[in-house]
Design a protein with these regions (language model features):
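Start-transfer (signal-anchor) and selected internal transmembrane alpha helices
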Residues: 1-21, 160-161
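Extracytoplasmic loop-helix module adjacent to an early transmembrane segment
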Residues: 20-58, 70-74
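Loop-to-helix entry region of an early transmembrane alpha helix in multi-pass inner-membrane enzymes
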Residues: 62, 66, 76-92
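Aromatic- and kink-enriched transmembrane "portal" helix at the membrane-lumen/periplasm boundary
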Residues: 65, 79, 93, 114-137, ...
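Transmembrane-helix motifs of polytopic, lipid-linked glycan transferases
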Residues: 84-104, 143
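Transmembrane-helix signature of polytopic, membrane-embedded enzymes
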Residues: 97-120, 138-139, 155-158
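Membrane-interface transmembrane helices that cradle and orient dolichyl/undecaprenyl
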Residues: 142-165
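Transmembrane helices and adjacent periplasmic/lumenal helix-loop junctions
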Residues: 168-174
């Protein structure tokens, strides 16, 4: 029962923080980030059949463009889709930080530790008012840290599915 309360609080915190701190939020009239506008443009082009690096070019990897392309399907003229993805990413950061904390402490202590995660991932210049590529990669890195620490506690026995999932996350990062 308390885990659902924690999940709800993490989700609410994610919505509030992204709503206030991200230019992708509907409360901002325009997203002033040049990078985010570039990613959205390439993502929209992909959704219309253009081939990245051939028909349109920007220097980031295809995962970023796919993410923004999917965001454009949610809302073509705004960054609402991007804001929804940012909320999901911040929630994942909070949850994974909580899970890491639970490996070494009580639920209450892990919860408090997780509440500090946004302080570090949403600060300038790393967050830069939303949707930086680095921000989207935090869950992949935290997942690897969690799996490594948990494996250490269990004689380094890791399931094939966990290896596969971590491999997919590494593929996204690189």
């Amino acid at each position: 029962k308390s885990i659902f309360l924690i999940i709800g609080m993490f989700l609410l915190l994610s919505i509030v923080l992204i709503g206030l701190l991200s230019y992708s939020s509907p409360i901002y009239e325009f997203n002033y980030s040049g990078d985010n506008n570039n990613y959205m443009t390439v993502g929209k082009a992909m959704m219309h059949g253009f081939v990245p690096y051939k028909d349109v070019f920007e220097q980031k990897g295809p995962f970023v463009y796919l993410l923004y392309g999917l965001a454009s399907l949610i809302s073509f003229h705004t960054f609402l889709g991007s804001a929804i993805f940012e909320i999901a990413i911040l929630f994942a950061i909070l949850w994974l930080t909580f899970k890491i904390g639970k490996l070494f402490s009580s639920t209450k202590v892990a919860f408090v530790i997780a509440l500090f995660a946004p302080v570090f991932v949403l600060m300038e210049p790393y967050y830069s008012y939303g949707a930086t590529v680095e921000f989207f990669l935090y869950p992949a890195m935290l997942s690897l840290i969690y799996v490594s620490l948990k494996a250490q506690q269990h004689q380094f026995i890791i399931s094939k599915w966990t290896w596969y999932f971590q491999g997919c996350l590494v593929g996204i990062v690189f």
